[in-house]
Design a protein with these regions (language model features):
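Short alpha-helical DNA-recognition segment
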Residues: 13-32
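A short, Lys/Arg-rich alpha-helix, primarily the initiator
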Residues: 1-11
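Short, charged recognition helix plus adjacent turn
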Residues: 11, 43, 50, 57-69
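DNA major-groove recognition helix of helix-turn-helix
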Residues: 34, 44, 52
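The alpha-helix within a helix-turn-helix
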Residues: 9, 20, 49
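Residues in the recognition helix of alpha-helical DNA-binding motifs
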Residues: 8, 22, 33, 62
């Protein structure tokens, strides 16, 4: 889960549906990015950061704890 990305989206008043439309992708594709299942292409990553007005480098970090092997 990319908790920072989800937090920023919600704090800016977006649902996944409205945010995905704002950045030009499908809701399902955006959901996969937010859960960490997919990496956004560079152009989409830049649009996401621009719409959220966030320019830190940690927005796409996965924050799920790593389990033992």
């Amino acid at each position: 889960m990319r908790a920072k990305l989800q937090q920023l989206r919600k704090s800016n008043g977006y649902t996944q549906q409205t945010f995905s439309a704002a950045v030009g992708t499908s809701r399902s594709h955006y959901a996969q990015i937010e859960t960490g299942d997919k990496q956004p292409a560079l152009g989409l990553a830049l649009r996401i950061k621009r719409v959220l007005n966030y320019y830190g480098d940690d927005i796409f970090d996965n924050t799920m704890p790593v389990g033992r092997k």
